[in-house]
Amino acid sequence: MISYVNKLGTVRVGDSNPVRIMGILNTSPESFYKKSISITKQRIVDAVNKMEEEGADFIDVGGMSTAPYLSTTVSEKIEMTRIVNAVKIIQRTTNLPISVDTCRATVAKEALELGVDIINDVTGLKHDPSMLEIIEKYCPSLILCAYSKKTITGNQLLKTKRLFKKSLEMAKSAKIPRTKIVLDPAIGFFRRKGKNSFFTKINSDWVKRDLLILENLRSIKLNMPLLVSVSNKSFIGEILKKENPSDRLAGSLAAEVLCALNGANIIRTHNVAETKEAITIAQKVS
């Protein structure tokens, strides 16, 4: 099978490269992890400088929380305003590639007009029909998450791969080469029920689904680079009985290390320094 040599923005990613770290910057007050929220100019500058000093390879900025269990949907205008303001500040602060976390075409367009390198679509291009037109025009790097508008039943590994393949077909139709694409298994976004349209409904235990995926990352990669985001996620809280996301650092680091050892190529995290150090040590002794 073909093994793709990929770049996410300007950074080479994949099995022949180090595990990369993507730092999370949220401009949405609704976000589930309050420590990641930066709204004012100075807080954004400070957060970006800190993540760069700690070793982040990318900055991922979001303007709307898509956590399935929260009622946090905002208007496109609000999301766009947050993203545009943050991107301009980040660009003046760092040369790191910027990823914009959005599934809305109008928001993606504004970000790409500003020169953003990467679009991170939690719905794998399946939410907004206009997204394909936008990405075809600007040809950004893409992070495509596993997602379905229909309820997913049966073998979760097989179904996740099928969802990836559908998103890859859609990207191909928009003339995006595979060498500009990274896949994300959407940990935390497969649920029995939720409060928005950005999650995939399943009829089985969502914690078991997430754990199954994390145990079998290599089997779902499709020879593509894989990004995994487990930082402070709900499955950690469920297992450790930690309701407050701020109490999930140890669990997050354990999960992130295992992801890296199991084949993840990029770790998206709220805890850049701790994650980078933990993965560095794990790789040295593995």
Predicted feature locations:
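Short beta-to-alpha linker loops that shape the active-site pocket of alpha/beta-hydrolase fold enzymes
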Residues: 62-64
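Structural preference for beta-strand elements that scaffold enzyme active sites
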Residues: 20-24, 57-60, 97-99, 117-118, ...
